[in-house]
Amino acid sequence: MPQPRYRLVDTQATPYYHCISRCVRRAFLCGYDRASKKNFDHRKQWILDRIKILSSVFAIDVCAYAIMSNHLHLVLHVDTDRAQSWCSDDVIERWLTLYSGPAVARRYKAGEPLGQHEQNALATLVEVWRVRLGDLSWYMRCLNEAIARMANQEDNCTGRFWEGRFRSQALLDEAALVSCMAYVDLNPVRAGMSKTLEQSEFTSIQERLNLFARRHSKNNSSWLAPLVAEEPESPESHEVQPRLPITQFDYFALVDWTGRAVRTDKRGAIPSHVKPIL
C-alpha cells in the first residue's frame, strides 16, 4: 500500500529527494509516440520552462533533472528555512504567480485598504501558502497539473497525463545525493538516446556543461543549485542557494567516468572513442 507523502518526506532527516513522474501507461507523450505516429518532443521544453518558473517561486532548488520521452526525473532540495524567511508580501507575490488567488489577496496587492477581518483572513492564508511553497508535493502538483492541462488542450481531450502520484526517494547522505544526480544526468545515455553528455538534451549535465563553456561570458548565470566550484552568489542576491557537496570538475569527471561503464542491464554507454569531457 502506498505510504502517505508526509511519511516519505521528512526534511529534518534530509532536504534532498529524487522525484519521478511517469506518463500514463508509460506512453511516449513527451516524445515520438508510435501509436499515434506523432512527435511530442516540444513538450519537453514545456516541462523545462515550468520547472524554471517553479524554481523561482518555491523554496525548492533543482540539483539535477532529466526530461525523457515518457518520464521525468528531478533531484530537489527543500529549503524550509528560506520559506520561513520570506515576508508576507513576498509570499503573496509568489503564490499569485502560480494561482489567481482569492479576491482579498488581489485587492491587497493592488493597494486597496482592507478591514481588520480581511487582514486577519489574509494573514492566515499567507501562512498556509508559506508552508505550501516549501512543500515537495505542492511543487510536483504545480508542475504536473500545468503540463497535463497543456497536453490535454493540445490533444483536445481530457483524462490523466501522468501515472497517479509521483514517486519520491529520500537521499540521506552526500554519497546518495551525488550518485543519484549522476544517475539522473545519465538517463539519455543509458537509454541509448545519446552518445555523449554534451548531446544529452533536456538534462542538467548538458546545461551545466554549456554554462561552463561560457563561464567567461557575462551571461553565465544558472538557475540550478550550484556546485562548490562555481562562482559565488552576487552581493545583490537576496537568497543564497546551498552549494552541492562536490566540485564542478569532480562532478563532470564522475558522470563521464560512470557513463563509460558498460552495463548489461542498460542499452547505452559513452563510447570509448569519445574524448573525456575535461
PLM regions: where:
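Short catalytic/metal-binding and nucleic-acid-binding patches
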Residues: 1-278
